[in-house]
A protein has these predicted regions:
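Sec-dependent signal peptide cleavage junction
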Residues: 19-30
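Bacterial N-terminal signal peptides
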Residues: 11-21
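Predominantly the structural core of cysteine protease catalytic domains
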Residues: 28, 62-71, 81, 88-93, ...
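Aromatic- and Gly/Pro-enriched, solvent-exposed loop/edge beta-strand patches characteristic
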Residues: 205, 359-440
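Extracytoplasmic soluble-region selector
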Residues: 476-539
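N-terminal zymogen propeptides
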Residues: 28-69
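Short, surface-exposed beta-strand/loop patches at domain edges
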Residues: 415-476
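Bacterial N-terminal signal peptides that target proteins for export
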Residues: 1-9
Length: 539
């Protein structure tokens, strides 16, 4: 008797779930040419950086000497060549160390400096088309690979599109007419979640916090003023001239409290130094590393970065340029970003907020199915939770439950500062006054709202138009097949975009499914295979 084919109709059903867990001899190569970025003045951040609630409180039992290199958390030294993108090399190295340290990548991970450099200055838009009109224009004759970057712009790029793998975007592309599409820009494997500015200057006052961040995450991002004649013959650097400018970015990967002050050409007053990973190749210093005195006055903009795997994540955002110099102060009022849902089968799982404040308490509210995008609260209050700004930088806030988003509707992320506290939030804004780089924002499709009395006012209008750096992070749930025809006795495997769930067949007399998603035809007819993870059911 001829076997009849079975057809499984798979349709996606999503319900709201609990929390989603997102998951010393100096050897200088005579041929090396140290390349730095254009000098920039440090801008002191007046906001106090440390706080008893910060994620990385320094502990008093830190050892006198530590090296992430010796512990296997640091990738190999690279050479930026003639390009001025030291910042990209430092950022990628810090990310690689974080991912290795936290078991999210192997020790041979290699992230693309070329991808980060190119898309910092060549925005192509985003998968939701919310930033398609935003442009960054490099006016410097050095071009995008040589113009350098403000360290505060680095965290913005890392949280906007993230980091790709070197294999897809090798560094050779930078000097060979690199180009790309929207799909390329967001073809990234890792995304920054939190960025914590430990200190903008005066690093001697923050030694314990810097050490703790290195110990926790493998390394930190930092900048200083490079001046060649201050490198000593013991892999050392100390500039006794008090500099308040920067021109080079590096990663700090360790420390030694007893590094002798006599190892420096110009002696500081005390022993102690940071172990620095550079980007001038292994021919510089001690296989690419050197020691910098704790007393180096130009050392600043020290950041600790956290990352997550960019696994089926979506980013709703309006801030398409990396303009680092705009922020908005909010007190006794609410702000909101309203987004239109343009994809199927998405759940809102987290919110990302850029802030120059720290320790500010606020209410976070999510409204869905808005009747009017110009009124962020004219919808269903899906969640409300009390939060506190943890970082000067980007703050990744996990929602207490996932929010199902319906294609074609609008949802709002509303932030309400508490107790009269001032929230100084990062913002994007058109600025064509800079010498090397100009930022142009397209506000035409944006709903960035400020509450004024009982009314909500669009912020993307008028002479002071701006865009709040508030992002909605979603997770898309999919199966590798939406239907299948299966003969009795045959098997095929279904694969879900989320692991850790359970499979179920609505009619086991027609088909069974095992714990690995293998579906086997048993009898004639139709049935539905359902997969459930963290309370989310799709089939």
């Amino acid at each position: 008797m001829k076997r009849r084919l079975l057809k499984f109709i798979l349709a996606l059903f999503v319900s709201i779930s609990p929390i989603l867990t997102i998951t010393n001899v100096l050897a200088i190569d005579e041929n090396y040419e140290p390349t730095v970025m254009p000098s920039r003045e440090y801008e002191h951040i007046d906001t106090p950086i440390t706080n008893s609630n910060t994620r990385s409180r320094a502990r008093s039992n830190l050892q006198a000497k530590y090296s992430s290199v010796d512990n296997g958390f640091v990738t190999g030294v690279k050479n930026q060549g003639s390009n001025g993108n030291c910042w990209a090399y430092a950022a990628c190295s810090v990310a690689e160390s974080y991912l290795i340290k936290h078991g999210m990548a192997s020790k041979n991970i290699d992230l693309s400096e070329a991808h980060l450099t190119y898309y910092m200055y060549n925005n192509t838009g985003d998968p939701y088309s919310n930033t398609d009109g935003d442009r960054t224009i490099v006016t410097s004759p050095k071009g995008y690979a040589g113009v350098g970057a403000d360290p505060r712009a680095v965290e913005l790029a890392l949280s906007t599109f993230g980091l790709a793998e070197e294999s897809g975007y090798p560094e050779s592309l930078l000097n060979n007419g690199m180009s790309g599409t929207k799909a390329d820009q967001y073809n990234t494997k890792y995304l920054l979640t939190n960025s914590k500015l430990i200190c903008s200057d005066n690093t001697q006052n923050y030694k314990d916090q810097i050490k703790q961040a290195i110990f926790d995450n493998g390394s930190v991002f930092a900048t200083y003023y490079d001046q060649g004649n201050y490198y000593g013959n013991k892999n050392s650097y100390y500039n006794p001239d008090k500099k308040n400018i920067l021109n080079h970015a590096i990663s700090i990967v360790g420390w030694d409290d007893n590094f002798d002050k006599t190892n420096f050409n110009s002696q500081p007053t005390e022993n102690g130094a940071w172990l620095i990973k550079n980007s001038w190749g292994p021919g510089f210093g001690d296989s690419g590393y050197f020691w910098m005195s704790y007393e180096e006055s130009s050392l600043g903009y020290v950041y600790s970065f956290d990352f997550t795997k960019n696994d089926h994540l979506g980013i709703y955002q309006y801030d398409g340029t990396q303009n680092p110099l705009c922020s908005a102060s909010i007190t006794y009022t609410n702000i909101a970003d309203v987004y239109k849902v343009t994809k199927d089968k998405e759940n809102l799982t987290a919110v990302s907020i850029g802030s120059k404040s720290i320790g500010v308490a606020y209410k976070l509210k999510i409204y869905t199915n808005l009747q009017d995008p110009n009124n962020p609260i004219a919808g269903t209050l899906a969640i409300e939770q009390e939060e506190t700004i943890q970082n000067v930088g980007m703050n990744y806030v996990q929602l207490n439950k996932e929010i199902s988003l319906q294609n074609g509707t609008y949802y709002a992320i509303v932030i309400e500062p508490r107790y009269g506290q001032q929230l100084n939030i990062f913002a994007d804004q058109t600025n064509t006054n800079f010498l090397d780089v100009q930022y142009q924002c397209d506000y035409s499709n944006e709903y960035c709202m400020l509450k004024n009395g009982n009314n909500w006012i669009k912020q993307g209008e008028g002479n002071n138009a701006l865009t709040y750096r508030i992002k909605g992070i979603t997770n898309k749930y999919t199966l590798n097949k939406t239907s299948m025809n299966l003969a009795v006795g045959n098997s095929e495997q279904l694969i879900a975009s989320r692991s850790g769930g359970s499979w179920r067949s609505t009619n086991t007399s027609i088909a069974t499914v095992d714990t690995n998603g293998n579906v086997k035809g048993v009898g004639h007819g139709k049935t539905t295979i359902t997969y459930t993870v963290n309370g989310i059911e799709f089939s």
